[in-house]
From Swiss-Prot:
It comes from the Archaea. This is Uncharacterized protein MJ0344.
Length: 180
């Protein structure tokens, strides 16, 4: 597990949870968290690119790169083809160092969302073609009914308790507590 640093550090008495009016919906089915390490199951291709082999039936939708101290490295882009993931960073990679790539992969049994209808929120597709949607509400009271449509022609209706939507605030840990 890696902890990413942030410039915002809550006071020790502050909660790391905050109520929010946003809901992120990414699909239904197999979502996998996987760590790759250069020199083990990933390789540095050039001074800004890392190549990774991934299972043919999984597709990345989010990833990040950490240096050997556990610090996040800014990314330019990531691309995938069946069985591979290529990550381009906005920094120069040092071939003598080890980097960790954290990827979230969608399994091919995943139902991809094609559309969402909300009775009281504003729906935005934030990753066109990947079925990742955000619902934003004007308030945090009551409930909302969402109709979620999938790529296989099925749909489902769910009820969202708008008063129970939470987010985790970023926190910077002292170096001694950083986990890489």
């Amino acid at each position: 597990m890696a902890v990413l640093a942030s410039s915002t550090e809550p006071e020790p008495t502050e909660s790391l949870l905050q109520q929010t009016n946003e809901l992120l919906i990414i699909g239904k089915g197999a979502i996998v968290y996987k760590e790759f390490t250069t020199g083990v199951d990933a390789r540095i291709i050039d001074s800004q690119t890392i190549g990774i082999g991934i299972p043919f039936n999984y597709y990345p939708f989010m990833c990040m790169v950490l240096d050997d101290a556990g610090n996040g490295i800014p990314m330019q882009e990531f691309t995938s083809a069946p069985g591979s993931l290529t990550v381009k960073v906005a920094a120069t990679l040092d071939s003598t160092k080890t980097y960790k790539i954290i990827a979230f992969l969608i399994g091919d049994s995943m139902k991809i969302i094609t559309s969402i209808q909300s009775q009281s929120g504003t729906v935005t597709e934030i990753a066109p073609g990947f079925g990742i949607f955000k619902v934003i509400y004007n308030d945090t009271e009551g409930t909302d009914t969402l109709t979620i449509n999938y790529d296989d022609g099925t749909s489902e209706t769910i009820t969202v308790d708008k008063s129970n939507l939470w987010t985790v605030l970023p926190m910077q840990l002292p170096d001694a507590e950083r986990v890489a």
